[in-house]
Amino acid sequence: MKLETAYNYFEKLEKDERLQNYISQANSRYILYIANEPLENFPHYTVNLDEKCTHIAFSYLNCGWRFFLEKISDEATKCMEKASEILEYLYAYSDCEKLYKEYYRLVCSLAYYISAQYSKSFIILGKYNSDSYIGKITKLFLTRNFIELERQLEIKYLKNDEETSSENKDNIIYEKILSNAFLHIINFIRTGKMESLESSKDMVRDLITLADINNEPHMWWYFRLLYLVFEEYEDGSLWKVVPPLLDNDDISAKYIYANLYKKKPITEFFKSQRECLDGELLKNDGFVIGMPTSSGKTKVAEVTILKTLTKSPGALCIYIAPYRSLANEVEFSLSSMFEIMGYQVSQLYGGSQTSPLDRQLTKQANVIIVTPEKAKSMLRSNKDLKDRIQLVIIDEGHLVGFQPRYITGELLIEELKIVLKKNNGQLVLLSAVLPNISDFSLWIGEDDKAKRMSVWRPSSQRFGELSLARNTVNINWEGETPSYNKNFITPKLVKPERITKTGRKYAAKYFPADKKEGVAATATKMLDVGSVLIYVGRSNMVLSQARIVSKLFEEKGIEHEWRNKNDWLFVELACIEEYGEDSEILSLLKQGIVPHSSKLPTEVRQSIEKLMANDNPKIIIATSTLGQGVNIGVSTVIVSNVRLDESNTVKVNDFWNIAGRAGRAFTDTEGKILYAIDRNKSQWSIYNQIQMKEMYFKYRNIEKATSGLYLLLRYLFILSEEFEIEYSLFLELLAENRESIDEQKAVEFFSEADQFLELLDDTLISMDIMNEANVLENSSSWIDDVFRSSLAFIQAKQDQSFSEEKMIEILKARNSGVIKLAGEETKWHSIASSSVPLRASLVIEHRIDELLKYVRKYIDSDKSFEELLSLVMELDIFIDSLPISKIEGIEIGANFSEIREGWFSGTSIHILEKRHENVRSICNEYYSFHFPWIVNAIAQKIKLIDCQEESKVLEQISLFAEIGLNNNKSVKIYLAGIKSRNCATELSEKIGMDNDLVTPVKELLLEFFNLCVVKKEDCSEICFNWLKLLNDEKEAKEYVKVKRRSFQFNIPFDLHDNLLYIKKVQSEIWLCSFDYKIKIPVLKEKALFNECSDIPDIFLRKEKGDVWILDSHNPYIIFY
């Protein structure tokens, strides 16, 4: 087909409404197939729809082939993707029994791969079954099962040809040439040698010609598509993408091998990753990346980090994750990649403050993962660390707004910009939901072009309505041709109509009776498609919905088994620690039902998230907490309720964060999002529900991310107008702290404004230090340099009522007031390093002698547990007196003494709960977060006046409070992985230690575990289970240890790469070149070769003369 003809034909295909309607019908029918709709319920589709659509698909393939040859990539990709979608609709559902389905599935998979839809290609091949050699090795290649592919090729080349070849002579030729082509592309994957890739493409071109000569169109199409697969493999391959970005061949190869030899090999980058990994963009001082959920942001972060460490080996890279759960996930991902390359990755332990343990870890680390609160504390209290920072990555960067945490996070970024500018470092912001990305690129990169945005996803999405009418659920799927699952859930009689002896009539009861039951029944039926997430707006809805699902599971006999035994054991132990043996949460989890919300205790939530990420839950019931960053995917999302309270609904961007979980890479070609509508309500309610659904389903309705600082300053300005304070007097009021206007007005203004000013004031004093305000003629002149590039300033430009100049004037005025409040410059460091609000910091300064007296009393005592509790009590009383926002519902009263004693002694919360109300809030919110935050601030202040011993005591107590223990040994054991306070206490009495780091403690725990196993050392059952979990995690590492050996022999052949691969077929061992042109049987020292012949990619590398050394590209093989 000529190019002009291809264009004309492609245009005709796209514009022909009749043909496009056939495709829409096939799509509409496909969802009915995969949702197991009975055939009798199908609407009347066009006669011979399969034949018509198959012809259309191959027409697209024909156009795509021509476009690819002419390097017209956009049209080529569109043709291939359209063709593969059509073939998927026709032949890729589970119960398909159509003629030639396997061939069309193979073609579908190849076309998906060519269009860079690697995930969809992988999934379709999972449904492909073929007994043919060609089909098998193609599937092995595209599903990245390189170990089995090489085994098949070994058999082909090292066994008798008659045993492994087809009976058909043409097939024998095809198989030989194709096998050779796969050998060469495997060599390209292993070595990055382009000549091997080119050779493989040349061989496939020969096969295209041969199939044409033999007049075998089915093989001709297969070879054409395979040729384009190899072309795409070149474009997407790590060998093509990574080296130009890193500009260091050695580091590039290490990174590629670390990806290639993972248990699930990564050999290419997604299209979204290639779109965002731009060499020119990476040169910017800052840039923004916008990519949908599950599109591979972490890989973009990896390459950016690696580029920094390649350029500056001693640099420190900081990854800021908004939540601990996401930080845990990122640490696992980054450490599994970088530690094999020799880089140290650490997630800093604990909550919001920097501990001595954190400082030790940062000295050794190349990459640290922190929450914003920890980053703020670390930045202000560790100058040496600050000077090392060369890269900061902000994940979930759209989280700005008027919430206090978002405001302080945004101000932290402004501080980091100052540090990075001084260090010539780089700032990167990642987000999945960022409609106004240009505002952020101007903020982060100071350039509208400092951004890349991709809308590509590894799976498509289908939206629909779950409609409950009376006791029936119908599903209406949206699309060019809508489709319907009518009577998806039909009524089931629960209790028949009855009349009592008194004549009172009771109506019959049916299931589902309400929307909750309808949602539960739909979710249960949708398990045929894959796992389901039910979204509810409020935490108190999670368990009630989960109970309905649980009851359904019991009725239907649905059982579940978690495949990952270690992760499940972690969940069991965490639940027992928090709730005791009789735990409703644990009972639900045993059924494969996962309740998830912010109300879960930290260790339980994190253990559940790890379990979900590594395994396959059946049904998850969750709030928006699950949408923020945690990488958990499902096949179907059902939005059951969007109400947060009577007047507020979930934001559109939170909806899309949740919707983004539908469609798992390498599991689902399509994610399904259902919005539940209760049509049993009034007409007005139904209308409102439909309006809400339509608003959420339109991506363009996502709220723009608005600067919290801008909103805060605008609020202060509006507040001044409400109190009728003239603008000039308002500025004086901020600068003079109540002294410039009528006292009553000042008191009223600050009573409203103080809670917002406390979010800003300590950052201003920290920035005063960074900008050396004390030596400036005007101590606030630096405000112009810093905040005219802020997000607040950029967005204030768009506000006519509150201009950007007013914003700068308000900041300057407030900075003057802050400097007056802070007093002499010698106190500034103390205030900034404390990381608490300015007013609270000043009170601490004023009462520092009183605090020192309490601490010294403890130091001079016998440091018993009672003395520790006495010091904690004094600190509780002091914290309660501070002018700082209190935790709602918590008052330090008489019952605190028993709770305090129980918490610090390691008593499980579920036991304390039996004795006192509100225990969880006191322990998890006050002692685990609020108390350590303030006590650490005190520790930082007294350290600056050279009271080192007193500071160390307070830092220890802060860590004790955060975890709920009372000595360093038990804390180290807890942090090393024994996430039970009871067990950490027990083990601390059995194990001796003197090292301050966590890693050696792990080694001591593993040694003790071996003693428990071998010598039956005394240990409780639950402690033994925690130790076993720690031991199993160590053994689960991907490393293989092999003894490095050398051999001496001579071969009369020229080897291009001086490598001989060790191959074994049955009992025979061979040394072979990668293409098997050289095959040497091993006759001597067979046992030595036998030890490593089953290890993939192990070879002999020729050294000097006749000496050969055992070696491998695989970094997970450790030679000793």
UniProtKB/Swiss-Prot annotation:
<keyword id="KW-0347">Helicase</keyword>
<dbReference type="InterPro" id="IPR011545">
    <property type="entry name" value="DEAD/DEAH_box_helicase_dom"/>
</dbReference>
<dbReference type="Pfam" id="PF00270">
    <property type="entry name" value="DEAD"/>
</dbReference>
<feature type="short sequence motif" description="DEAH box">
    <location>
        <begin position="395"/>
        <end position="398"/>
    </location>
</feature>
<dbReference type="InterPro" id="IPR050474">
    <property type="entry name" value="Hel308_SKI2-like"/>
</dbReference>
<keyword id="KW-0067">ATP-binding</keyword>
<keyword id="KW-0547">Nucleotide-binding</keyword>
<dbReference type="InterPro" id="IPR027417">
    <property type="entry name" value="P-loop_NTPase"/>
</dbReference>
<protein>
    <recommendedName>
        <fullName>Hachiman protein HamB</fullName>
    </recommendedName>
</protein>
<comment type="similarity">
    <text>Belongs to the helicase family.</text>
</comment>
<keyword id="KW-0051">Antiviral defense</keyword>
<feature type="domain" description="Helicase C-terminal">
    <location>
        <begin position="521"/>
        <end position="710"/>
    </location>
</feature>
<feature type="domain" description="Helicase ATP-binding">
    <location>
        <begin position="278"/>
        <end position="452"/>
    </location>
</feature>
<comment type="function">
    <text>Component of antiviral defense system Hachiman, composed of HamA and HamB. Expression of Hachiman in B.subtilis (strain BEST7003) confers resistance to phages phi105, phi29, phi3T, rho14, SBSphiJ, SpBeta and SPR. Probably a helicase.</text>
</comment>
<feature type="binding site">
    <location>
        <begin position="291"/>
        <end position="298"/>
    </location>
    <ligand>
        <name>ATP</name>
    </ligand>
</feature>
<dbReference type="GO" id="GO:0051607">
    <property type="term" value="P:defense response to virus"/>
</dbReference>
<dbReference type="GO" id="GO:0016787">
    <property type="term" value="F:hydrolase activity"/>
</dbReference>
<dbReference type="InterPro" id="IPR014001">
    <property type="entry name" value="Helicase_ATP-bd"/>
</dbReference>
<dbReference type="Pfam" id="PF00271">
    <property type="entry name" value="Helicase_C"/>
</dbReference>
<keyword id="KW-0378">Hydrolase</keyword>
<dbReference type="GO" id="GO:0005524">
    <property type="term" value="F:ATP binding"/>
</dbReference>
<dbReference type="GO" id="GO:0003676">
    <property type="term" value="F:nucleic acid binding"/>
</dbReference>
<dbReference type="GO" id="GO:0004386">
    <property type="term" value="F:helicase activity"/>
</dbReference>
<dbReference type="InterPro" id="IPR001650">
    <property type="entry name" value="Helicase_C-like"/>
</dbReference>
